[in-house]
A protein has these predicted regions:
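RNA-binding accessory domains that recognize and position tRNA/RNA substrates
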Residues: 1-2, 6-20, 27, 31-167
Length: 167
C-alpha cells in the first residue's frame, strides 16, 4: 500500500478467474477491491494460532489451527462483499473470501511446512474453488517433455545437463 507500489489491472477481476492472494498478495487484492491494509504495530512472524470460521478453503478443517505468518502490515478491513473466514490474535483478517468475484486471500503462508493444514487450503482452492482437476503427476510431465523433445529432435542425439536443485 506504499506510495508508488505496483497496481493490478482491474480487468483481471472481470475475467471470472478464481484468484488467491498469499501474504502481500492478499493485501494487494484487498486494496485493489476497496479493503484496507494498515501497519498495526503488532506484526507476526512465526507460528501463530488462527481461528477459522468456515470458508471454502477451510472445509472440514479444525476451527483452531497453527499457521505461519510473516508480516508487519495486514488487511484490517476486507473488501466490500468479502467475508472474513480466519483471524489470529494480531491479524483481524487472516483470510477472506469473496465468492461472487472469485477472490480469496490469506495473510499466512499455506505453502510452508510450518502451516500444518496449508496443503489442504491450497488443494481446496485449486479443486473446490477453481475447479482444477488433480491430474498432474511428475511422471506425466516427464513423459510429455520426452515426447516434445522427440518431436523436435527426431532421430538426432541430444546432450542434456539437468540440475536437481542442490547445486
Amino acid at each position: 500500500y506504499a506510495d508508488g507500489a505496483p497496481r493490478m489491472d482491474a480487468a483481471i477481476f472481470e475475467q471470472g478467474i478464481p484468484t488467491l492472494g498469499i501474504c502481500y498478495g492478499a493485501q494487494r487484492l484487498a486494496l485493489e477491491l476497496g479493503g484496507k491494509v494498515e501497519q498495526t504495530g503488532a506484526g507476526e512472524y512465526g507460528k501463530v494460532q488462527m481461528r477459522v470460521a468456515g470458508g471454502a478453503m477451510f472445509a472440514e478443517q479444525p476451527a483452531e489451527q497453527t499457521a505461519w505468518m510473516s508480516h508487519r502490515d495486514t488487511v484490517t478491513a476486507p473488501p466490500a462483499g468479502a467475508a472474513v473466514v480466519a483471524t489470529s490474535e494480531h491479524t483481524p483478517v487472516a483470510a477472506f473470501e469473496d465468492k461472487a468475484r472469485g477472490v480469496y486471500g490469506v495473510q499466512f503462508h499455506p505453502e510452508v511446512v510450518h502451516t500444518p493444514h496449508g496443503q489442504e487450503v491450497l488443494k481446496s482452492f485449486l479443486y473446490a474453488v477453481a475447479g482444477a482437476a488433480p491430474v498432474w503427476t511428475p511422471a506425466a510431465v516427464s513423459e510429455e517433455q520426452v515426447e516434445r523433445i522427440r518431436a523436435q529432435v527426431g532421430s538426432d542425439r541430444v546432450l542434456c545437463a539437468l540440475s536437481g536443485g542442490v547445486d
